[in-house]
Amino acid sequence: MKRQYAVIGNPIGHSQSPYIHRLFAGQCQQKLEYTAKLVAMNEFRAVADAFFQEGGHGLNVTVPFKQDAFQYAEETTERATAAQAVNTLIRQDNGLITGDNTDGTGLVTDLLGNLNWELKAKRILVMGAGGAVRGILQDLLDQQPQHIVIANRTVEKALQLSRQFAGSGYILGCSLDMLDG
């Protein structure tokens, strides 16, 4: 029997996740079905409930539902709790839905391993203050940059994130208008 997985978001048509996961499953001789699901803005909980009730095993969560997924999870990993955002929901053997956030691990692994970028003592600019940014900040701060600036259209969101992660390093929030060429 194939395990059921999906990526959910809005929009979702651009996602390459189904293609990538099917290729990976084939390489690992795993039997799985991986689909993309467009979810209406107020339907996250209903869609996630139906997916898991119908035997679904795991969901990848993208824009704009990462904070909804954090609220949905019955238990969360340390990094998901720090981010207060979830991009991965998995039904455990005991039935509990666990939320994790792998955004930061993926980004830092790519920057260090594939691009050979050193982040320690560097100045980092992050554009935006949504769920993906929540997921990357702790992993970036763990690399001990000189500082991180979060720039966002809505300055209050950037400031809120800078306060949330202030205990982990030097982090500032500002509006996009405050950036100087």
Where are these regions (language model features)?
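Phosphate/diphosphate ligand-binding glycine-rich loop within oxidoreductases
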Residues: 2-115
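Glycine-rich adenosine-cofactor-binding loop
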Residues: 9, 101-104, 111, 115-145, ...
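Short beta->alpha hinge that forms the Motif I/post-I loop of the SAM-binding pocket
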Residues: 39, 153-154
